[in-house]
Amino acid sequence: MSGYEINFDGLVGPTHHYAGLSFGNEASTKNRNHLSNPKLAAKQGLLKMKALADMGMKQGVLAPQERPHVPSLRKLGFGGDDHAVITQAMRTSPELLSALSSASCMWTANAATVSPSADSADGRVHFTAANLNNKFHRSIEHETTSQILAAIFRDERYFAHHLALPPVALFGDEGAANHNRLGGPYDSAAVQVFVYGQQFLGGQVAPKRYPARQSLEACQAVARLHQLDSNRTVFVQQNPDVIDEGVFHNDVIAVSNQQVLFHHQKAFFNQAQALNEIREKMALLEQDLIAIEVPDQRVSVGDAVSTYLFNSQLITRPDGGMTIVVPEESRQNLAVWSYLNDMIQMGTPVDQIKVFDLRESMRNGGGPACLRLRVAVNDAEFNAINHNVLMNDALFARLNTWVDRRYRDQLSHQDLADPALLIESRSALDELTQILNLGSVYHFQQ
């Protein structure tokens, strides 16, 4: 039996705009109210997906969500027909309309936490949609996320789906952006590493400037839901000082693949102790941790955040070597680019760099790792997936044509009140569900 890691990238939605909604994410805040280009954003994402598929990787597509989200506006007291709801919202609360038009679901690293069957007691792949309760504009995503994941991973013999945790700070959950898995082959047991920002019950250590979006209590709940073995599970606190420097998720300061953990010197609280626990638990599986620690004197936390060096993808190529996928911003920074080129000569499995232009996503605060949800499967599970969502030449061509017909090449905040945008977005998503064979996953389809 062989194993695969499938990267499911979020397709950027038609209402992609710069609203500066994510306090603690400095790129998001800095670019507030700039003009966006939804068509370019979607095409940049598709190019990355296709390039990885062409490398021999298993690559999937996750559909965007319905925006503007009229049902949420109705819950907040706006009435009339759908166009009236949007017009009222723009007139009296444009910030709310912006939040409920956000295309932030493109960052599918926050969609869910996924545990492979090799790690779960019942031998199934487990999914828990993230509640994302720390940010209002993202807290509405989990219901549709669950429906889309269930439309892709339908067979209950292989896949188990859990509802999001209770939407309170005690169980604040940001999904796979705070979750790593370290081990050998993708279909073999591994050590799952949950990274949290704060322990809410009895914890003393917490950031001061920016919020800790992930709680220890949420990590523990997900581990229980996924039926994980405590001997192969590690809970690690992120360094609160780096959260206060803009490291809002762990995938902004660390990334893992198989036995490799690529991380900054300041990534974790009590870092040496955390790495020792990971190393000891991997040893029980006869696996050695390869920790690539970037010294602060080579790359500062500020440079790591601005270039998204660690918000990269580490992928294993069919030839067994590893490639690090970084945004163009990493190449433009002298210190970061120098370190990357030194790293691929260090004799670790990481021996190749791939650079992608993801500027539309980066300006809103999301790099390569933000855009993808990793799902490790065996042969039987792979065959049970809805294959209409897997990237190939035909799907790439079809989705590019779809984007060309359906997306605008410029969007401002004022455009969100345009009645035509709502019609355009719904028509686009309705067609997309047919292309990807998802069924009726959106509220407007039901």
From Swiss-Prot:
Keyword Lipid biosynthesis in record: no
Catalytic activity: N(2)-succinyl-L-arginine + 2 H2O + 2 H(+) = N(2)-succinyl-L-ornithine + 2 NH4(+) + CO2
Coiled coil feature spans: none
Top-rank taxon, per record: Bacteria
GO MF term set: N-succinylarginine dihydrolase activity
One BP annotation, GO: arginine catabolic process to glutamate
InterPro entries found in the cross-reference section: AstB_sf, SuccinylArg_d-Hdrlase_AstB
Pathway linked to the protein: Amino-acid degradation; L-arginine degradation via AST pathway; L-glutamate and succinate from L-arginine: step 2/5
Alphabetized SUPFAM superfamilies for the sequence: Pentein
Signal peptide residues on this chain, from the entry's feature table: none
Binding sites annotated in the UniProt record for substrate: 19-28, 110, 137-138, 213, 251, 364
Pfam families (alphabetical): AstB
Keyword annotations: Arginine metabolism, Hydrolase
Protein EC: 3.5.3.23
Top class in the EC scheme: hydrolase
Catalytic residues of the enzyme: 174, 249, 370
Cross-referenced NCBIfam families: arg_catab_astB, PRK13281.1
Purpose of the protein: Catalyzes the hydrolysis of N(2)-succinylarginine into N(2)-succinylornithine, ammonia and CO(2).
UniProt-listed HAMAP family: AstB
Quaternary organization: Homodimer.
Family: Belongs to the succinylarginine dihydrolase family.
Protein name as it appears in the record: N-succinylarginine dihydrolase
Organism, scientific name: Acinetobacter baylyi (strain ATCC 33305 / BD413 / ADP1)
